[in-house]
Curated annotation (Swiss-Prot):
Protein name (database record): Histone H2AX
Keyword DNA repair set for record: yes
Gene that this sequence comes from: H2ax
Impact when changing residue 10 to A: No effect on radiosensitivity
Binding partners and assembly: The nucleosome is a histone octamer containing two molecules each of H2A, H2B, H3 and H4 assembled in one H3-H4 heterotetramer and two H2A-H2B heterodimers. The octamer wraps approximately 147 bp of DNA. Interacts with numerous proteins required for DNA damage signaling and repair when phosphorylated on Ser-140. These include MDC1, BRCA1 and the MRN complex, composed of MRE11, RAD50, and NBN. Interaction with the MRN complex is mediated at least in part by NBN. Also interacts with DHX9/NDHII when phosphorylated on Ser-140 and MCPH1 when phosphorylated at Ser-140 or Tyr-143.
Length: 143
């Protein structure tokens, strides 16, 4: 016979994705393809897409964690753009990173300037007791 076929020899191992090798959910192969296709550099190393996919996965997980907390605070089970906006703008580092980003349907942070808030007057606190040493007949000239 001519030696065709693979009756003997080692069986090929099951293919394992680079994402699973790195322990990531984000696609390392797709990130690598996009880095090559984007012409960011003439060549792309093997570790670069793994690192970039890990960074993207971490940032996504961080934002989704905070947005999930915002949704739970509002007694909702579904994350909407408003929850993403609240999560990002209330976190100092994420707000700095995504400062120039506009989130559609995100709204604004609730904020009322202190000067616009109603002043707490002494009348709302309660009637003042007369000071010790003054007689009740000597009323002050306060208006």
């Amino acid at each position: 016979m001519s030696g065709r076929g693979k009756t003997g020899g080692k069986a090929r191992a099951k293919a394992k994705s680079r994402s699973s090798r790195a322990g990531l959910q984000f696609p390392v192969g797709r990130v690598h393809r996009l880095l090559r296709k984007g012409h960011y550099a003439e060549r792309v190393g093997a570790g670069a897409p793994v690192y970039l996919a890990a960074v993207l996965e971490y940032l996504t997980a961080e934002i989704l964690e905070l947005a999930g907390n915002a949704a739970r605070d509002n007694k909702k089970t579904r994350i909407i753009p408003r929850h993403l906006q609240l999560a990002i703008r209330n976190d100092e580092e994420l707000n700095k990173l995504l400062g120039g980003v506009t989130i559609a349907q995100g709204g604004v942070l609730p904020n009322i300037q202190a000067v616009l808030l109603p002043k707490k007057s002494s009348a709302t606190v309660g009637p003042k007791a007369p000071a010790v040493g003054k007689k009740a007949s000597q009323a002050s000239q306060e208006y």
